[in-house]
Amino acid sequence: MATLRHFPRGFACSSGKKLAIFEHSEANGVTKKEIELQDPVDNKPKDEDAIEKKAPSKNEEHVLATSVSPSGRYLAVCDIVKQLHLYDAEAEWTRLSTRELPRRCTSVTFTQDELHVLVADKTGDVYQYKVIDEDGDSKSEEENKGAQLMLGHLSMLLDVVLTKDDQYIVTCDRDEKIRVSHYPNAYNIHTFCLGHKGYVSSLVYIKENNLLISGGGEGEIMVWTLNGEKCTETMCANESQKSSQDHGDFGVKTLAYDQQNSVLAAICYRCSRVYVYKLEYSESGVSLTKSVTITTDEEPWDICFDNEYQLWVLQPRADNCVRVYQWSDDDNMLKMLDSEKSSRASCVQRTINSSWDFFKESVGVSAHLPEGLRKVKVDNMKDYLEKKQERVSGIKRKPEQSEPTESTEKFQKQS
């Protein structure tokens, strides 16, 4: 699965073992730079059979999570071989460091001051790493091996975000929980946001109103206060739309939010649609109103809003890899980009669409979230009732008695 992340001058994309930076400037127009991720370096002797078992399969994605820092200067990339790569945009995307992670990452984010990067993993832990050391240089490989454990869940973490001024760290997991913890003292839990009936896959923080939006495996989107109060909720798709899909899994994959127009976009697993909502505020509270449902050619890989509040949809389509939509106040909905009104976005879009050789590496690659996120329901009651009925009816099975042997008969006669 390919990813799409926006920074002030363009977009950072990942596909396979490579990154592609699409950068726009008035002098040079749109430029493209490809970066290949560094392979792990380990001088310790290892058993060849063990290496073969740990090697990722061809249908697994190599990049598991990416994040751009608030200013757009730094890019963090976590891969399937348990490495954290940091790049500096101001130094022409120079790699600052590559650090070894204890477990495979599921989500990564930066603090607001950009001094630290937080990595959530499959075992439910969040580790903190320094971006730059006190001397202004990236830390050496030996120093980078150490990491500060911030918090831990008893279930796989799926997303992590930080709130305004890094006051709280919010994490969500496979077991329907959203946890709001104080930062940096994350052992001090502020509250839980409980209400989802499936795994919680994506979080969005609204800075202006201090609200949290979550998307779950049951297909529901919920809006919360940071005190754990649920403001509103909505279902992504109705039953008719669900039945039209080939598969039953309709969990929310990714959420993206436009702060300027209060517009929320959501994509789901195994669904070729983008659901767009308008977040409205009134005296009675907060509400999510569906604005439009955008039909795509394929199931989207990723979505994001740029700094011009335009929605970018990345999909596995050779002739139309990325679609761009802009908000229309007249129609109160997202509409296809008008190239005359945004020549800059159109130039970037054309460059991305002409880079199918880069994106095709992700075609057919499954998302890093495993199919086992949904809990398997075990019907123990059926077996219990059957055994109970056997006891009531007196049909309880008894072990068969073996036929008496000659020695047994002789012993019985003597006695």
Cite the ranges covered by each PLM segment:
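Terminal intrinsically disordered, low-complexity extensions flanking WD-repeat/beta-propeller proteins
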Residues: 231-415
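Per-blade loop-tip surfaces of WD-repeat and WD-like beta-propellers in eukaryotic adaptors/scaffolds
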Residues: 23-32, 47-50, 81-98, 122-148, ...
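Canonical WD40 repeat/beta-propeller blade segments in eukaryotic WD-repeat proteins
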Residues: 1-3, 56-68, 103-110, 155-162, ...
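Conserved strand-to-loop turn within each blade of WD40 beta-propeller repeats
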Residues: 15, 78-81, 120-123, 171-175, ...
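Intrinsically disordered, low-complexity acidic/Ser/Thr/Pro-rich linker and tail segments
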Residues: 1-65, 69, 354, 358-415
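Contiguous mid-protein beta-loop-alpha structural module that forms a pocket-lining wall or clamp
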Residues: 194, 199, 206-224
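Short coil/turn segments that connect the beta-strands within blades of beta-propeller domains
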Residues: 8-9, 71-73, 113-115, 165-167, ...
